[in-house]
């Protein structure tokens, strides 16, 4: 207790989570097992989750290690140290509940008089995804791979024809290793054909022009004028009184289609009614006629 200062932010996390009705927000305790340790309560994992994001520690494995060696976490979790599987599953299963908790936190800030609720600024930030460029596919990329497979298969078949001719002058024992190697190559091409046929089907079933196989919602995005990365475009809305974030949402679209949705969600989080006016500041990347019209119709100017 003495090793955690009274003004340490970890105490705010502890007090805030302890006051929440987590079940009402949608957080569920893990299923009890007949053997092994009892499951962790959602408040333990939620405190760990928030601590990780506050201190820029997102990896489940790193959080597991921090639970053991970090004094602040030892205090916050009362000596408990969940494994990385439990931490990762908690995040995966409670996406909607975490959004509800964020809205409740914005309400808490408003009740504390920390929000002006008259002016917000909206801007986007690019965050690199776990998904690599290698595992991001467009129609052009799939076509390129399928064409390569087709050409490689034709080459293998030509080589088999040549081996048939060689058997007339060479023994079967001399030719067979080459034939086996070609057949192995054809089997690998068959597997790759199935892979890219499945990717093509996924691409056909989405309205986007690309798919990502690791982070499904991430997209290939222009980060700067010449650098493209597989990333998320995170929209943030900040209240002007104390520069506190009142809305955040990871998207895969560009800024031009994001203003109305970000501003509307921020207005809801601020507990403002549709007829209440809200000034929204944004750079020229958001200035599309349809988005501005939608905002104006809902008293966001």
Regions found by a protein language model. Name each.
Residues 5, 9, 36-44, 59, ...:
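Secondary-structure capping and boundary motifs in well-ordered enzyme cores
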Residues 39-98:
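Short, positively charged, Gly/Tyr-enriched micro-motifs
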Residues 5-50:
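Basic, short loop/linker segments at the boundary and entry of helix-turn-helix/winged-helix-like folds
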Residues 88-300:
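Polybasic low-complexity intrinsically disordered regions
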Residues 24, 52-56, 71, 263-270:
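Structural motif corresponding to the C-terminal cap of alpha-helices
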Residues 28-34, 44-52, 87-88, 243-250, ...:
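Glycine- and acidic
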């Amino acid at each position: 207790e003495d090793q955690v200062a009274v003004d340490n932010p970890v105490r705010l996390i502890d007090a805030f989570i302890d006051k929440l009705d987590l079940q009402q927000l949608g957080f569920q305790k893990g299923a009890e097992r007949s053997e092994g340790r009892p499951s962790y309560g959602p408040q333990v994992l939620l405190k760990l989750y928030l601590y990780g994001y506050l201190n820029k520690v997102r990896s489940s494995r790193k959080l597991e290690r921090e639970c053991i060696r970090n004094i602040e976490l030892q205090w916050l979790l009362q000596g408990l140290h969940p494994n990385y599987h439990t931490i990762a599953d908690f995040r995966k299963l409670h996406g909607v509940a975490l959004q509800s908790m964020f809205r409740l936190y914005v309400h808490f800030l408003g009740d504390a008089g920390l929000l002006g609720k008259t002016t917000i600024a909206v801007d986007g930030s690019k965050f690199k995804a776990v998904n690599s460029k290698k595992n991001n596919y467009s129609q052009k990329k799939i076509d390129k791979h399928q064409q390569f497979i087709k050409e490689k298969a034709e080459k293998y078949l030509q080589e088999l024809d040549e081996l048939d001719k060689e058997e007339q002058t060479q023994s079967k024992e001399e030719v067979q290793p080459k034939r086996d190697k070609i057949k192995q190559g054809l089997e690998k091409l068959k597997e790759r054909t199935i892979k890219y046929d499945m990717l093509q089907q996924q691409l056909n079933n989405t309205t986007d022009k690309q798919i990502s196989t690791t982070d499904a919602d991430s997209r290939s995005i222009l980060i700067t004028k010449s650098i493209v990365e597989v990333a998320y475009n995170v929209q943030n809305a900040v209240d002007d009184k104390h520069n506190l974030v009142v809305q955040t949402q990871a998207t895969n679209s560009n800024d031009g289609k994001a203003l109305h949705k970000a501003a509307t969600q921020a207005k809801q989080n601020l507990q403002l009614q549709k007829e209440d006016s809200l000034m929204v500041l944004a750079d020229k990347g958001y200035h599309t006629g349809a988005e501005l019209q939608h905002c104006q119709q809902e008293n966001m100017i």
